[in-house]
Regions:
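Flexible, D/E/H-enriched segments
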Residues: 1-58, 69-153
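Residue-level marker for buried hydrophobic side chains located in beta-strands
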Residues: 60-62
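Active-site metal-binding loops of divalent metal-dependent hydrolases
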Residues: 66
């Protein structure tokens, strides 16, 4: 699974910086069906509900780039489609959109599992914190899209 999901080593330094010392359980995912994503999301939600009060605050996080190596205009268009499904808390819609639009979102599976878990935990809304692409830092013809989204439950 690590071949397709390298988000742990990308996010871990940020988490260590913000949280200091903490315990975490990484889940590295590769190819799962929509049903497997739903089942795993529900299992994560069950563990969250069972353990959250016992161990203190549990934070669930998923990490992914959005579109890869496209023009800024095309990246913004495709990212907007994926973000629409994410902000609607629509895991099947995200999978469908990424497949139908051929969006190169490398973490679509972890994001889908996260959305299923969030919905199982009663999430009602997601909020876009920031959306940008690598061309926002320096002009370039091909960019990678990024976004941060908060989901409260």
């Amino acid at each position: 699974p690590h071949l397709h999901d390298h988000s742990i080593e990308v996010q871990l330094p940020f988490l260590q910086r913000v949280l200091g010392e903490f315990t975490f359980l990484p889940i590295s995912l590769s190819h799962l069906s929509a049903e497997e994503c739903r089942e795993l999301g529900q299992a994560i939600a069950q563990v969250y509900e069972a353990e959250n009060s016992a161990v203190g605050k549990i934070v669930l996080a998923a990490s992914s780039d959005l579109s890869h190596y496209l023009s800024p205009k095309e990246t913004e268009r495709l990212d907007a489609l994926a973000l629409e499904a994410i902000l609607a808390l629509d895991p099947p819609g995200l999978l469908r959109t990424v497949e139908e639009e051929n969006i190169s979102m490398c973490g679509v599976i972890p994001t889908t599992v996260f959305l299923f878990a969030a919905k199982a935990l009663g999430a009602k809304q997601a909020r876009l914190l920031k959306h940008c692409h690598s061309g926002d830092v320096a002009p370039m013809r091909e960019v990678v899209g990024y976004a941060s989204v908060a989901v409260e439950f």
